Regions:
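Secretory/periplasmic and organellar redox-cofactor proteins
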Residues: 1-113, 118-120, 124-125, 200-220
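Compositionally biased, low-hydrophobicity segments enriched in charged and small polar residues
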Residues: 2-11, 97, 134, 138, ...
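Membrane-helix boundary connector in multi-pass membrane proteins
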Residues: 23-30, 174-191
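Extracellular/lumenal glycan-associated surfaces
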Residues: 111-131, 145-146, 150-153, 165-182, ...
Length: 220
């Protein structure tokens, strides 16, 4: 139940909070630096928690299928046949070792790193290229969504989530032709960013040596 509660707090609630922060400049016409920093802090928590949530769901399914009471296992825990205890770590462990263990289910392929950078760049297009609404609002919104999608996909169990950026890339290509307010440079950069996202999204990127049971087949 602790993992489930943590997943609810870090998953849906964080995504909703990030969404409201994303639309803030569009709704009120100004940026809030503290709000953006808060959104970044919340966003970075998501990929580090997803593998634990997937493991919890898998355990509950497998344990229930073998006839064990669902709610008893949910609140009090249980063990699958043949399972073993994980490695222990002392409280005085080196910070580097703690960070390494925390990031076991997270990898950052260069394709997703560049995708995140493109998203961040698009969020600043209004200031850099002097774009005006409605294109400036579109670039900010899509850029924030691209950044959020790429960072969530750093979690290996959520790697297929990156395919959402294909839709965002297609919109970036179309947006300058259907929305006004863009400068020539800003519109051109938006189109090129969309094309780049299409190419960057297709490769899965590197994986580490970790395996996630039956979830491995979904990591494409």
């Amino acid at each position: 139940w602790m993992v489930a509660l943590f997943g609810i707090v870090v998953g849906p609630l964080v995504v909703i909070s990030i969404y409201f922060i994303i639309i803030q400049p569009i709704a009120i016409g100004t940026y809030c630096t503290i709000c953006l920093l808060a959104a970044a802090a919340m966003l970075i928590m998501i990929p580090f928690s997803l593998d634990e949530i997937v493991a919890m769901l898998q355990f509950m399914v497998w344990n229930t299928r073998r006839g064990r009471p669902f709610w008893r296992a949910f609140f009090r825990g249980d063990a699958l046949p043949g399972s073993s205890k994980g490695g222990t770590m002392s409280f005085d462990a080196h910070p580097r070792e703690i960070a390494r263990q925390s990031a076991r289910g997270v990898t950052v392929p260069w394709t997703l790193g560049v995708s995140a950078a493109i998203g961040l760049f698009l969020m600043l297009s209004r200031a850099i290229f002097d774009n005006a609404l409605p294109l400036a609002g579109s670039d900010h919104l899509v850029g924030a969504l691209v950044l959020t999608t790429a960072v969530i996909a750093w979690a290996e169990v959520a790697r297929p989530f990156r395919f959402l950026n294909i839709g965002f890339g297609l919109w970036l290509i179309v947006a300058p032709w259907v929305l006004g307010g863009g400068t020539i440079a800003g519109s051109l950069i938006g189109v090129l960013s969309g094309v780049a996202l299409l190419g960057l999204t297709l490769p899965r990127g590197k994986r580490n040596a970790e395996h996630y049971g039956s979830w491995d087949r979904y990591i494409v």
